[in-house]
Amino acid sequence: MVQNEKGEEITTRLTSGWRVCIDYRKLNVVTRKDHFPLPFIDQVLERVSGHPFYCFLDGYSGYFQIEIDVADQEKTTFTCPFGTYAYRRMPFGLCNAPATFQRCMLSIFSDMGERIMEVFMDDITVYGGTFEECLVNLEAVLHRCIEKDLVLNWEKCHFMVRQGIVLGHIISEKGIEVDKAKVELIVKLPSPTTVK
């Protein structure tokens, strides 16, 4: 995180350079809220656990795959030292972005959800009772991704595995387990030194 000359914080990523973060609080205040519910994490975990084979797919730059209506693009306008810009695709920071994205993903996979796969935002879990069944299910999901121009981040995808991490939990045929690496990180945190 670095600050520009106006004291605004700009997030940086070591691997991919600059990442633009826009403060859309003023826009969000006047935006009519979309109350589309996100799935409950515990229910997602229950549905995906207990299978012998999995494929874990990750949507590439999730929100950014959704186009913004031309009439709404001007609402995302921002100015930076390089000029004035407006997004053509949905950025982070818009209050309705999570609901819009989840609705879109559920629409894309409406006939597959809870039967051969589960989707939570840009995380897609495909499963099967046998290796062959999981492979057939994966093929169906990948065909749908191609059909709908949904781009995946292959570096974050895992294919035909016995277990994996979903929403911070380890899932497998045995069920749901806590990710011990996450617990260790929390245990190693220093104790708070101030009280608010």
Residue ranges and their predicted role:
Residues M1-K196:
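Retroelement reverse transcriptase polymerase core
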